[in-house]
């Protein structure tokens, strides 16, 4: 991964948006360009120089709802009340939580629920990107930084957009200042074939159909969300360590193709367990919290959770020992086991690798950190 030679400017100054866009179009550039102004923040995510998503902080969901409304007549699987569902789950449900791009999670959810296809998600992302880039090109003053790692790194990607072609489309709409048009005119693609195919690397090329530069990615594998508000799932937490309810029960009928993912958490600190419970939407996850690692081993065998979070510093039976024991059981050879630790040095990573842990989560963590590791490992 290459770090851009872009200085981090903390103070507002005159900026040239087109020049910043040029700097992130190199084939080895991956990360997020964030540009700050008095009106809001622009976040432009790129992978190998191609734009994969763009958003504006002050209007994150409004454009999404609007473009979904425009697409709904063409998509029979998109329900009329979809905006209300998204608002309840991804706006109200995560209010005041540290998730950088809940709008992108909403798009992933739409694909996972089969409301839209990956190619339709690509069209949606391009329309949003055009709107964001257009407003970004109007910016005259601000500050910026480039972050090599971003929230989208471990999430599904639906398209790779050519930034220059996006700028050209903005010009065609006639809403880009003349100065930007003159500067961009020297970069126009002379060969018509480049409008139809853009190489990303030696193994992949981005071919365009409609829209002309959108490449759908494979269907993402993310947790499915049950939006039936009348459904309640019984969960056992650390405050009730002796009441074991294996699996979950439903108080009303729901569609059989909606799965609730069971997350088994082992930590001697009830506060940590409660934080995990509060971070995870109970319409997606059934959380089981245990403070005793010895009891946890037998209960894991009974509940067969979809993902396991283990504090490595548990007394009696530490996280590494517990993970090693689980891996010896045929059922748990491939179950995601995440080591939760306050330190993630080379020695700790090596120990986790020896016991075949799936990954690690460093304390303290926020909701965004937790969702990233779960979305990365759950199937």
Curated annotation (Swiss-Prot):
Keywords: Heterocyst, Phosphoprotein, Two-component regulatory system. InterPro entries: Bact_response_regulator, CheY-like_superfamily, PatA-like_N, Sig_transdc_resp-reg_PatA, Sig_transdc_resp-reg_receiver. Its main location: other. SMART domains: REC (SM00448). Induction: By nitrogen starvation. Induction requires HetR. Transcription positively regulated by NtcA. One of its GO terms (biological process) is cellular response to nitrogen starvation. GO terms for cellular component: cell septum. Residues 181-226 are annotated as: Disordered. The modification 4-aspartylphosphate is found at residue 313. It is found in: Cell septum. It comes from the Bacteria. Residues 186-212 have a biased composition (Polar residues). The keyword Transcription regulation does not apply. Residues 262-378 form the Response regulatory domain. Controls heterocyst pattern formation. Required for the differentiation of intercalary heterocysts but not for terminal heterocysts. This is Protein PatA. It comes from Nostoc sp. (strain PCC 7120 / SAG 25.82 / UTEX 2576). The gene is patA.
């Amino acid at each position: 991964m290459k770090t851009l030679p872009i200085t981090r400017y903390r103070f507002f100054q005159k900026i040239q948006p087109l020049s910043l866009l040029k700097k992130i179009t190199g084939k080895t550039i991956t990360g997020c360009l964030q540009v700050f102004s008095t009106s809001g923040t622009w976040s432009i995510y790129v992978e190998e120089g191609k734009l994969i998503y763009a958003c504006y902080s002050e209007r994150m969901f409004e454009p999404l709802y609007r473009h979904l409304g425009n697409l709904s007549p063409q998509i029979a699987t998109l329900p009329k009340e979809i905006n209300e569902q998204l608002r309840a789950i991804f706006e109200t449900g995560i209010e005041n939580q540290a998730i950088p791009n809940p709008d992108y999670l909403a798009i992933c959810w739409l694909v996972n629920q089969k409301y839209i296809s990956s190619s339709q998600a690509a069209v949606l992302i391009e329309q949003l990107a055009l709107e964001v880039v257009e407003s970004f090109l109007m910016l005259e003053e601000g500050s910026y930084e480039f972050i090599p790692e971003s929230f989208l790194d471990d999430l599904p990607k639906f398209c790779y957009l050519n930034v220059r072609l996006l700028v050209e489309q903005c010009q065609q709409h006639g809403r880009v200042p003349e100065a930007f048009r003159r500067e961009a005119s020297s970069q126009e693609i002379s060969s018509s074939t480049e409008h139809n195919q853009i190489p990303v690397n030696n193994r992949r090329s981005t071919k365009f159909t409609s829209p002309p530069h959108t490449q759908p990615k494979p269907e993402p594998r993310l947790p499915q969300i049950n939006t039936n508000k009348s459904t309640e799932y019984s969960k056992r937490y650390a405050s009730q360590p002796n009441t074991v309810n294996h699996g979950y029960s439903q108080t009303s009928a729901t569609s059989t193709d909606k799965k609730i993912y069971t997350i088994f958490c082992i930590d001697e600190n009830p506060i940590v367990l409660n934080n995990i419970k509060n971070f995870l939407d109970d319409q997606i996850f059934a959380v089981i919290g245990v403070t005793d690692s010895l009891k946890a081993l037998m209960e894991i065998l009974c509940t067969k959770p979809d993902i396991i979070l283990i504090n490595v510093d548990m007394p009696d039976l530490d996280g590494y020992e517990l993970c090693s024991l689980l891996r010896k059981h045929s059922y748990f050879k491939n179950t995601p086991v995440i080591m939760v630790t306050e330190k993630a040095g080379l020695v700790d990573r090596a120990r986790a690798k020896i016991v075949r842990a799936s990954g690690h989560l460093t304390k303290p963590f926020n909701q965004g950190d937790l969702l990233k590791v779960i979305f990365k490992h759950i199937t």
